């Protein structure tokens, strides 16, 4: 509990290497992470817009008999 085992030192060295090594700046790493998140969100947005356009195309026709009866009553 008082001392650090070898696995703790490996983790500490990995974190230090990530922060100060690698690309040289933490901001560069965070910038890359932000670009990845933005690309992921854009991909989700593109998928949802495709679904919306598909729903609009099929949404013009009633899908069930109950919807057809509702339209007839109106």
Swiss-Prot record:
The Tat system comprises two distinct complexes: a TatABC complex, containing multiple copies of TatA, TatB and TatC subunits, and a separate TatA complex, containing only TatA subunits. Substrates initially bind to the TatABC complex, which probably triggers association of the separate TatA complex to form the active translocon. Pfam families: TatA_B_E. It is found in: Cell inner membrane. The chain crosses the membrane at residues 1-21. GO terms for molecular function: protein transmembrane transporter activity. Its main location: membrane. Keywords: Cell inner membrane, Cell membrane, Membrane, Protein transport, Translocation, Transmembrane, Transmembrane helix, Transport. Belongs to the TatA/E family. Residues 64-74 have a biased composition (Basic and acidic residues). This is Sec-independent protein translocase protein TatA. One of its GO terms (biological process) is protein transport by the Tat complex. Gene3D superfamilies: 1.20.5.3310. GO terms for cellular component: TAT protein transport complex. It comes from the Bacteria. It comes from Caulobacter sp. (strain K31). Residues 43-74 are annotated as: Disordered. It is a single-pass membrane protein. The gene is tatA. Part of the twin-arginine translocation (Tat) system that transports large folded proteins containing a characteristic twin-arginine motif in their signal peptide across membranes. TatA could form the protein-conducting channel of the Tat system.
């Amino acid at each position: 509990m008082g001392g650090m085992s070898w696995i703790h030192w490996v983790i500490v060295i990995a974190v230090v290497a990530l922060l100060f090594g690698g690309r040289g700046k933490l901001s560069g790493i965070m910038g890359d992470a932000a670009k990845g998140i933005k690309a992921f969100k854009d991909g989700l947005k593109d998928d949802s817009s495709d679904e919306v356009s598909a729903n609009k195309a099929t949404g013009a026709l009633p899908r069930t008999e109950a919807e057809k009866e509702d339209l007839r009553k109106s």
